[in-house]
């Protein structure tokens, strides 16, 4: 969001249209020339890769956020075992982000089916609000919680020996004309 805001401030004459969708759907829209450019974080299906120009953009780290009132808030780091004592608020189980996080946790010998998921929501904003109200903990992109960290409504806690990151990529159709707006971005 911050990158888009900066771009819009620098180039107010360029019309931005922001869509949130699955990486698969966005890739299809790029190939079908319905969208010029997209920033995606999910895995791009192999069948679409040959028809796309893919440029790695930035590393996106996910943070474990907890309410300020939680006993772990005074710790800067917790163990993997501590995760089993948290109530989690997550995206729904079909979410690409949720699957990605579950996969990383599983690779680190964390039984995701044993985690206490008390709430599944459809938006990051809803998750951040629920955490700030003290309802539970969640994994969210660090770039999505800058305001909450500044306002001190939540705490970030590191997990010993675990770091969850993904690469955000810019994708476009190599066969399409690249406008000046595209080049500016």
Language-model features, listed with the residues they occupy:
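Flexible hinge/capping segments at coil-to-helix
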Residues: 51-62, 66-89
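Alpha-helical segments flanking ligand/cofactor-binding loops in enzyme cores
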Residues: 27-28, 55, 81, 128-129, ...
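Short beta-strand elements of ligand-binding domains
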Residues: 37-42, 66-67, 91
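A late-sequence structural motif
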Residues: 155-185
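Hydrophobic hinge/microswitch elements
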Residues: 22-35, 41, 97-154
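Short beta-strand->loop
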Residues: 52-62, 150-164
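Central regulatory/effector-binding core of bacterial HTH transcription factors
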Residues: 1-45
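Secondary-structure junction motif
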Residues: 72-73, 87-109, 178-180
